[in-house]
Amino acid sequence: MKSVNTIHEVKNIVKDWKKQGLSVGLVPTMGYLHEGHGSLILKARENSKVVVSIFVNPMQFGPTEDLEKYPRDLEKDLKYCEELGADLIFSPEPGEMYPEGFCTSVDMSVLTEELCGLSRPSHFKGVCTIVNKLLNIVNPDRAYFGEKDAQQLVIVKRMVRDLNMDIEIVGCPIIREKDGLAKSSRNTYLNSEERRAALVLSKSIFTGKDMVKKGCRETDVLLKKMKAIIDQEPLARIDYLKAVDTMTMQQVDTIDRPVLIAMAVYIGNVRLIDNFSFIPD
């Protein structure tokens, strides 16, 4: 495994792989890797070579968000990537990705108006810009994203389609702790009491999933029950809890098409997300 931090080095290495006819998979991350990221890296090994990018992207953090506090441990991440069989790690400094005079961004108006885009207005502009740059730098055959960030996955797929990029975007299932909590780098912010309280997210998700499987199709009934579970926890504060069309990200009243049920919930000061999708017969 090789680790580099300049765009020039990545391009040269990948160019050499491509000359040999090798396929390349990219796993974009912000580091502080856990088993969720690990599942993406393992899936990406269906390619000849695996590139993992580690970059805490300042452009996707709002002015009051946790950029400086976001957990980082590059040495541990490198060891983990090597254990999982990654071939190349790209961990640039902010100045490498956004040099002086950088003034271009990629924005998407339609799919960013709901869910995380509503409470984090500039977030997806930052996501689209950095993902676009990484796809251009690495030029992978496939790129891998977790379904926990479901809205991000939909947006990246649309961006790749709209900009005629010949890259397959692969979504990978949510990986959970043994007690059900979706794995997230931000889980490390939780103290023991908050960690216990955070289980209301997965409890609500599992209840909602069960209701839909048993035939519930009215989203107001579904969301009311899911909200009641979260409201029982004093440390929990709902940012959003919505049912949206998986293609348009617009809210729906009836589950008569593929639907995403998504939530963002503050546990104390820590914002966590979770979701499930359902495709009716």
From Swiss-Prot:
Gene: panC
UniProt subunit comment: Homodimer.
Protein's recorded name: Pantothenate synthetase
Localization annotation: Cytoplasm
Function per UniProt: Catalyzes the condensation of pantoate with beta-alanine in an ATP-dependent reaction via a pantoyl-adenylate intermediate.
Predominant localisation class: cytoplasm
Binding, (R)-pantoate: Q60, Q152
UniProt pathway annotation: Cofactor biosynthesis; (R)-pantothenate biosynthesis; (R)-pantothenate from (R)-pantoate and beta-alanine: step 1/1
N-terminal signal peptide: none
Residue numbers annotated as active site: H37 (proton donor)
InterPro entries, per database record: Pantoate_ligase, Pantoate_ligase_C, Rossmann-like_a/b/a_fold
Record EC number: 6.3.2.1
Family to which this protein belongs: Belongs to the pantothenate synthetase family.
Any one of the GO CC terms: cytosol
Binding site for ATP: 30-37, 146-149, 175, 183-186
Remarks, miscellaneous: The reaction proceeds by a bi uni uni bi ping pong mechanism.
Binding-site list for beta-alanine: Q60
BP GO terms, sorted: pantothenate biosynthetic process
Catalytic activity: (R)-pantoate + beta-alanine + ATP = (R)-pantothenate + AMP + diphosphate + H(+)
Organism this protein belongs to: Ruminiclostridium cellulolyticum (strain ATCC 35319 / DSM 5812 / JCM 6584 / H10)
Keywords: ATP-binding, Cytoplasm, Ligase, Nucleotide-binding, Pantothenate biosynthesis
Molecular function terms from GO: ATP binding; pantoate-beta-alanine ligase activity
Pfam (any one): Pantoate_ligase
